Amino acid sequence: MAAASEHPAVAIAGLEGGYGESPVLHDVSLDVHAGEIFAILGKNGMGKTTLLKTVMGLLPARSGRVEFLGEDVSGWPAYRITRLGVSYVPQEKSIFQDLSVEENLRLALRDVSGFAERLERVAEWFPILKSRHRQRAGTLSGGEQKMLLIGRALLT
């Protein structure tokens, strides 16, 4: 395999997917390079979330390829993709309301060694993650819950 720097960070080729018999994604192809700022725009129901969920292994693709840094992850389950250090912050809140902020953050990690140091770095952007680490996540405001989700993605 060639060095990772020779590959786009994300490469999608001919991706097809949807829900049941309803096709949503039709031959989607794109490359996103490391450091590039990229946005997916469109009206409601156009497939933005379906695309992200399919790329992340949360929905099965009907056909096509997805690669992260040259590694073909087509057909991989989401937990295996996250082990590559790839994260996704969903538009719907996916926190565990009854767990603490810290417990929600730890869920993203397969290896919790160095958690305190990593949390310190993320808390530079989102201090609430440290100051309220024992608080039940369900008691956070909507904006604070979004910070928790972004922090969890950054920790992976």
Residue ranges of predicted features:
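Short beta-strand immediately N-terminal to the Walker A/P-loop
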Residues: 38-39, 88
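Conserved ABC ATPase signature
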Residues: 136-140, 144
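Helix-to-loop junction immediately C-terminal to a conserved catalytic motif
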Residues: 56
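Conserved ABC transporter NBD signature motif
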Residues: 64-72, 84, 117-118, 124
